[in-house]
Structure formats: C-alpha cells, structure tokens
Amino acid sequence: MAKEKFTRTKPHVNVGTIGHIDHGKTTLTAALVKVQSKRNLAKAISYADIAKGGTVRDETKTVTIAAAHVEYESANRHYAHVDCPGHADYIKNMITGAAQMDGAILVVSSLDSVMPQTREHVLLARQVGLNHIVVFLNKCDAVDDPEMLDLVEMEVRELLSKYKFDGDNAPVVRGASLPALQGDPKWEETIQQLLSALDSYIPEPVRDIDKPFLMAIEDVFSIKGRGTVATGRIERGVIKVGDEVQIIGFKDTKKSVVTGVEMFRKLLDQGQAGDNVGCLLRGVEKEEIERGQVLAKPGSITPHTKFTGEVYVLKKEEGGRHTPFFTNYRPQFYIRTTDVTGTVNLPEGVKMVMPGDNITMTIELIAPVALEEQMRFAIREGGKTVGAGVVTKILA
C-alpha cells in the first residue's frame, strides 16, 4: 500500500496531556480522537492502544520514554498529541523534550482536585518553558454540586498562578471524558469546547525556519585554494552565500562570512533548518574552529559557563549510575555536538542525588559554550549517559 501523503493545509501544533495518575489523561486522549473521528478529523484509536503506547527516544538516543502519539484536527488546526502512561515517563519526556509540546492540557479530576503529581507536572512545565496550559476538569458527570466545581477550579487557577502561569485567564473546560468516549452528546460537546480552547489559547509556534540561523559544528576540514568548511545540521533559520555569521564557543567569538553552502557536494542557494550542510567560511583557518562550536546569526546567541538545569538522573536499569552523586561531582556535559567538563552544585539542603531522581542543579562549565534557556543537554561519564537535562536559567 502506498504511504499516505501528509498534506499540510492547517497549521500544526504539538500538545500533550499532563496531570495526576487516574485523573483521566488517557481517557481524554481517546475521547479527543473518537469525537473528531466522527467528523472525519481523526482516525479512531482505542483506549487500549493509547494506553499501550509506543516509545520515543530523546535526541541523545539514550533515554527511552513510553509515550503514545495520536493526531486529530480541530476546525482550524492539526494537532499532534502525546500521552505518557507513567509518571516517570512524563518527567523524562518533559525534561528531554523527546516529544515536544507547544502547550499542555492539564487534566484534573473534579472528585480529587489538585494532587501531588498535578503540582509536579505544572512545576516541570514552568521549568521547561511551556507557557500555555489549558485545563480540563474531568469527571464532572460524577459531581452534582456546581459549587464543588467552582472550588476545584479556584484551586487549579491558584496552582497555575503560583507557578507563574496565567491562572486568571487560562481556559478551564468542565467535562467528562468517559461518557464522551462512550458517545454521550452532552459530554462530547465538552470535547469541542476543549478543542476551541486549544485553538484560541495556545499560540501558533514560530517555525524553526523563521528563527535566527544556528548550526552546531560537527566537523571541520579545509579545501585547498578555497578555505575552511564547517559541516553540521542546521538547527534553525536559513543560511545564504554572503551572510555574516559568528563562530561561538570555547574561544573568543569570531566573525566570518559564508562564501559557499553545499549539501551532498552540490552547491545550494541557501540551507535551511533540518538540512545537513557544509559552510565555506572566509578568512578562517582550520585550527581556529572546532567541533562543538556553533555558527550563528551575529548577536542571536552568546557563550556562557554557568547555568541552572532541571535534570533527570538515569536509573541503573536505564544504563545510568548505580550509586548517588554529591555536590562537586564533575561529569561531562554533552551540549549539541560535544562534551564539556563541568562541576555540579546541588541545591541547599540536598546532600546527594540518587539514580531515578529529578533535581534542579547549578552547573559550571570549564569552557564557554553557546547556551540558551530551554536547551537540552546530556550528562555523561566515561562515554555513557547518566542524566538528561534542560537549561532553565543562565547565570554567567
């Protein structure tokens, strides 16, 4: 059978369900698909298939995360939706960014209100730079007293405000995913309300191609009579012959001009996000540039050595450490294309970190690297990955 062609008629947005165990995240995911499949805006998938999930790998290909991916459309958009079966999978997914989210659907059972994992997921969403949360108050079919629902809604809004989300204006939809999944029209309508809240509240993401140019350097070689070529995959933006770039990381930042762009040995007018290219750089000696530096649009990113990160420490079964580590631990930090040694400082009152924990830590690198908030990194020791993290704040 021929593969279905993906036709891009509507803007694409990535979302996911977050919230406490048994509050109905997977049932809601199934209901979204089911309700939209009746309108020919999704392919129906059973609850069991979503719960079974698939697996995703993070960019460093070390952390395996159980996650189900479904897709559906609203009137205006195409959504890809991720739902994780286990609490640990949510934490790993949010920290590694393996399944990206532009916004989240926070599912809260109106019978239980805010629970520990509700808080933890909202805090993590804040740490990893998710700015838009739409709330679905679930199981409203089991609550007779509307004042009870007002109370739960108030608690959820307070929680959002506490973690610097817009608790006053975030949409809160009161619904019930199980009867909606079973075809009850009254509750199916709440799924439509949720979709229109997603459409109006989560802004359309800026496409990678529209962001300022950045390419992490993977390899460098010189071409006799032409100069030095840096190769790598363009992370974002566009590069054309004649563009000025900065070479950032490890040493003093240097400026150059791109005099040629090639892909698979063919000359291009321009390279764009996702392309693997070689950039010919004017006036740069091969010795002045190395793997792990980046080429970037001047002024768009700066080198740093000190930052805080939210880190997930791999368990022994995931190939991580067997023992805890302490403040002043000195592993390698794999950032974009290279390892840089750094020193870990744990928060006050935290004596040690066990495999399987997630923790906020301060990291100081021995050499400056092009860094920005929400960037992912891996922690390695002797060539194996022992942690995965995201930059939450740049300090120096």
Swiss-Prot record:
Monomer. Residues 19-26 are annotated as: G1. It holds the Pfam family GTP_EFTU_D3. Its EC number is 3.6.5.3. This is Elongation factor Tu. GTP hydrolase that promotes the GTP-dependent binding of aminoacyl-tRNA to the A-site of ribosomes during protein biosynthesis. NCBIfam families: EF-Tu (TIGR00485), PRK00049.1 (NF000766), PRK12735.1 (NF009372), PRK12736.1 (NF009373), small_GTP (TIGR00231). Residues 10-206 form the tr-type G domain. Residues 83-86 are annotated as: G3. The keyword Cytoplasm applies. Gene3D superfamilies: P-loop containing nucleotide triphosphate hydrolases, Translation factors. Residues 176-178 are annotated as: G5. Belongs to the TRAFAC class translation factor GTPase superfamily. Classic translation factor GTPase family. EF-Tu/EF-1A subfamily. InterPro entries: EF-Tu_GTP-bd, EF-Tu_GTPase, EFTu-like_2, EFTU_2, P-loop_NTPase, Small_GTP-bd, T_Tr_GTP-bd_dom, Transl_B-barrel_sf. It comes from Sorangium cellulosum (strain So ce56). Its main location: cytoplasm. The gene is tuf1. It is an enzyme of class 3 (hydrolase).
